[in-house]
Structure formats: C-alpha cells, structure tokens
Amino acid sequence: MNKIAHDDFKKADAELNKVYKKVIEVLDVTEKQLMIKAQKDWLKFRDSHCKFEIEQFKGGSISPLIYSTCLSERTNVRIEDLKSILEDKNR
C-alpha cells in the first residue's frame, strides 16, 4: 500500500510539473515571477501541511501511507488550480 501511494504521488507530481510548465509559458514576465514564487511557497506549504497531518501517526507504520496520500491529494488540487489558470489565459 505504501508503494502504491508513493507511486500515485509520483504520477501526480509529474502531472503537476507538466501543467506548471504550460502555465509558465503563457504568462508575461511579471506574472511568471509571481507564479514562480507562488509555486515555491505552495510546495513548502504542501510539504509542511502533510508533515502536520502525519504527526499523530509519528513512528507508526501507517505514516508513509498517510504522508504520500496527503501529498497526492494536495498536488491534485494544485493541478486543478493551475489548469484553471491555464484555461483563463487561453480564453
């Protein structure tokens, strides 16, 4: 189960990078700078949030599963946010 959850996260992360690059391509210089900062901040938030989520399971065998699942969930939400930005820019 841990491997499946980790693999799911890796797939989501690859999709995130793909969509992020598409968004960056359609932004002007100022928007690009802001998006780069926003994405870096979001990555820090995602990782911190998921570390918080597993704190109650610290040391337990379920921790890796909870952590990977959290990363996947947060990443999938971000993908949808970025797709929305991309759609707005392509109108």
Regions found by a protein language model. Give the residues of each.
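N-terminal alpha-helical modules
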Residues: 1-91
